[in-house]
Regions:
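Internal alpha-helical transmembrane segments of multi-pass membrane proteins
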Residues: 51-62, 117-137
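N-terminal topogenic module of multi-pass integral membrane proteins
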Residues: 1-61
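Membrane-interface capping segments at transmembrane-helix boundaries
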Residues: 1, 175-186
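Membrane interfacial helix motifs at helix-loop boundaries and amphipathic/re-entrant anchors
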Residues: 15-39, 73-103, 139-165
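Alpha-helical transmembrane segments of multipass membrane proteins
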Residues: 13, 17, 64-72, 108, ...
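Hydrophobic cores of alpha-helical transmembrane segments in multi-pass inner/ER membrane proteins
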Residues: 38-48, 101-114, 165-178
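Short helix-perturbing small/polar motifs within transmembrane alpha-helices
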Residues: 3, 106-123
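Residue-level signature of transmembrane alpha-helical entry/exit and packing/kink sites
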Residues: 2-6, 57, 93, 97, ...
């Protein structure tokens, strides 16, 4: 039953991110391109899967990532208005356009799913901080990529997205640390 709930949530997440991203680029596309939620999804899926087996957490995290990514790219058929071919062709084209990220999800999903299981099993503050820290570290990673590599100016066009993401991560980290301190005092 838990796996069904995770798959349903992953499906809704993928469709929602596609709709949020939209077809017009700009601010909405920048919000839709935030990566941290895509890593948080399998981590939460691994947590929901239970605490018995790391393998189960990894499997459920991988399935959640795959379902969400497929939902995202198939939803793009309608969000982006690709309706000139028969539906099976459209699905194939949509999934082919996401091959790079689907491959990444096949690795990151199981890794973060297993981390979710570890976090649940050990009530790990470190795993909770990692989850919150994703929102802080992503903008920094993009800045490093921009400065050191072939980064694009696109991510710098809407700094409010990255500042807000960092603030969300910092607030979450603060709440986790405060909660952990209170729990250790009691």
């Amino acid at each position: 039953m838990r796996v069904l709930v995770v798959c349903t949530a992953a499906l809704a997440f993928g469709v929602g991110m596609s709709v949020l991203h939209g077809s017009g680029g700009g601010f909405r596309a920048q919000i839709g391109n935030v990566s941290a939620p895509w890593l948080l999804l399998p981590l939460v899926a691994g947590t929901v899967a239970g605490e018995q087996h790391f393998g189960l957490g990894a499997l459920v995290g991988g399935v959640a990532s795959l379902v969400a990514l497929i939902a995202f790219y198939v939803s793009n058929i309608y969000v982006l208005g690709f309706t000139g071919h028969p539906w099976p062709v459209e699905v194939g084209l949509a999934l082919r356009s996401g091959t790079y990220f689907i491959r990444i999800g096949l690795v990151s999903g199981p890794v973060f799913g297993a981390l979710g299981t570890v976090g649940r099993r050990r009530h790990s503050v470190a795993v909770a901080l990692l989850a919150a820290g994703l929102f802080v570290l992503e903008p920094l990673a993009w800045l490093v990529y921009f400065w050191l590599g072939p980064g694009t100016v696109g991510m710098l066009t809407y700094p409010a997205v990255w500042v807000a993401e960092s603030i969300v991560g910092l607030v979450a980290c603060s709440v986790i640390v405060l909660h952990a301190r209170r729990a250790s005092i009691v």
